[in-house]
Amino acid sequence: MKLNIFTKSMIGMGLVCSALPALAMEAWNNQQGGNKYQVIFDGKIYENAWWVSSTNCPGKAKANDATNPWRLKRTATAAEISQFGNTLSCEKSGSSSSSNSNTPASNTPANGGSATPAQGTVPSNSSVVAWNKQQGGQTWYVVFNGAVYKNAWWVASSNCPGDAKSNDASNPWRYVRAATATEISETSNPQSCTSAPQPSPDVKPAPDVKPAPDVQPAPADKSNDNYAVVAWKGQEGSSTWYVIYNGGIYKNAWWVGAANCPGDAKENDASNPWRYVRAATATEISQYGNPGSCSVKPDNNGGAVTPVDPTPETPVTPTPDNSEPSTPADSVNDYSLQAWSGQEGSEIYHVIFNGNVYKNAWWVGSKDCPRGTSAENSNNPWRLERTATAAELSQYGNPTTCEIDNGGVIVADGFQASKAYSADSIVDYNDAHYKTSVDQDAWGFVPGGDNPWKKYEPAKAWSASTVYVKGDRVVVDGQAYEALFWTQSDNPALVANQNATGSNSRPWKPLGKAQSYSNEELNNAPQFNPETLYASDTLIRFNGVNYISQSKVQKVSPSDSNPWRVFVDWTGTKERVGTPKKAWPKHVYAPYVDFTLNTIPDLAALAKNHNVNHFTLAFVVSKDANTCLPTWGTAYGMQNYAQYSKIKALREAGGDVMLSIGGANNAPLAASCKNVDDLMQHYYDIVDNLNLKVLDFDIEGTWVADQASIERRNLAVKKVQDKWKSEGKDIAIWYTLPILPTGLTPEGMNVLSDAKAKGVELAGVNVMTMDYGNAICQSANTEGQNIHGKCATSAIANLHSQLKGLHPNKSDAEIDAMMGTTPMVGVNDVQGEVFYLSDARLVMQDAQKRNLGMVGIWSIARDLPGGTNLSPEFHGLTKEQAPKYAFSEIFAPFTKQ
């Protein structure tokens, strides 16, 4: 079986056989910059949500912390910790429990200056050169005074490695290691910050991105060789422009204001983002114009918007007319509008506030209010775009004050074990809300916890060949230890494997001297008394069986069940997402939308402009592996997600969505929810509150072989289907599975066989026709030969045979109608696999011939040209090979009722 190691919200959704991760993983080491990092800290993997500073520590990050960009993704595996290291402290970066972490020959540069801890060896494909006042956004490895340095972000020629200090936010050079004798010999080893050769005066700096000082920069724009050139006319925003000014072409390196003039830009000017690129051609000047003055802007102030500070007490109401307002130069028609409601994140938002439309120029916090903003206010990222139309105010609303209404959302107090709670009390515990169904005494159940009594079993001697899982106890030399997670061959008696406080990634918790009882002590243990307050590790007897208390406990017997259940506050959600106007089509093109990306397309605009009316939203997963709480990608709650306005607008336009639960990464609800009834209720509530007609379960990665979650899911789906039937509701269920050209894997067939055995009625089986990892599907540089398309149609043909065997009473047409195919457009995760437009045409022909139930793609955000590598935001082909939404143009006609 192939295991998927990709995060679907970052790249794709297919099974991977032999591919590198989308993000290079490393131990946390004070990373700084606008790049996307994936780091290991204290046994967990974190990713930065926006620009990160070296002083931001993952260990201090919280789920919605606007001051810390690190976000917890999952627990690191033992292999990852072994390979990349495991930083344990915010105070000393680079400390690792792994002996395999890279350590430099010296942690002190040759010049004796302070240095950042080593960041590993120089990659084999990177050359080491002498420091020569390099400038730009590319990555250099330079020799200076006997040491090798690497720039952590955009570097200026005035930045000298000799001046760099640990965590220095003003100097991007970071010490890597001591230089070798060969490197010193070949580079001449510059030793002075003033003696390096001066860069040629006629060479202008490369148009690289440098963060503006003292502000959170917007996500780096991706430049394209085929950029559009326009005349400078006071452009404003975070889009990337190439403008003509006084015979030269300039590009903005970060957010640019209308008052920033290219003519005022200097080489290292941190106050002006314009950077010289090259001389404009005569044709470009003739075609686009050539403004030469900073004081005279053509075309009515050059199209620049002069910010207005409307008075909140007197809301601005535009005069209705039949004309649409002029669109700002940096507007993106494929992204949607919404009322301001305290949006937070690095996504680009277009919001309505007090009669106007605003757009954030960089990362925005929930406390940043559009009122009073201006281009000169570097502390507030909101920028006025235009006046909202009457239709927009009617559709999206018009907040006029900076007070954020929580929409009736319940705010719960933190759980206290020493406190008693009445029935229906709601508490907050580990960033989740729980509600108790009965009165709860002090020192009772902990929300989300197991019964505090554990059946007594003499701890067995530890064995190196035995696999231990969480909760298993062993004895070594008279000392007891408890496994904190899966472990094998890790001797608990070794300090290197011990985790006394739960603060590192080691597997064993020391418990002290092993408890052992004689038969007489066990038989004469005191009988359980609910009125007694028991200390932890107390032996009792209950119904003839001995138990040990795992915590302080009272009025809870070993047979009681935990009355606390995860509580999701769905207040107002049904209204936020709107109601579909039409039935879900029997044959539909429903591309996947990574609904946790920073740049989610405007679904209504796609319906209007590209005839794509149905989408599959991905992915709802558990908050973490141990918390039975649905979230969007672990990052966003279900109740008041800011992106719901996109669903409502799509439904108003006549389209609809289905939702996908699961994915390759993070824990599915079926894994974290051990109680089938709890799992069933979550499925019911998701469908009910998001007004869904179709629900998809994406089962892949390790979860396609996890029997416990497979069985829980199928049992819960059967239960919720029975409930829907009793209420007269017809909700379609699809299972999405990985596939090979030869058909489903044995694990995938097991999922379907178990579903059938438990009575689950599937509307369809969608397969991920991508990332096969098979030599016959290698298709790079074979455009037009339809290699990847043939692998997809072969997979569908073999799936048909497998489903026919599972459902012998269904006709061929019925089997075809319950199949779906979802390729990954463009460059796939598996190296050498590429899905071209010609492949799409072949897949479309096969889908129409068979009359399949569904066609999808991973993903709609990737249906854009750009780059040559993997990305969540483009397909890796040129615009000549596949223009914007070219794959959707092929597949969109597939939809029919």
Curated annotation (Swiss-Prot):
Q: What induces it?
A: Silenced by the DNA-binding protein H-NS under standard growth conditions.
Quick one: where's region Disordered? 90-127, 182-222, 287-333
- InterPro entries the UniProt entry points to: CBM5/12, CBM_sf_5/12, GH18_Chitinase, Glyco_hydro18_cat, Glycoside_hydrolase_SF
Enzyme type, top EC level: hydrolase
Keyword presence, Protein biosynthesis: no
Please state the protein's primary subcellular location: periplasm
Signal peptide span per the entry? 1-24
Q: Which Pfam families match?
A: CBM_5_12 (PF02839), Glyco_hydro_18 (PF00704)
Name of the protein this chain belongs to: Probable bifunctional chitinase/lysozyme
The record lists the organism as Escherichia coli (strain K12)
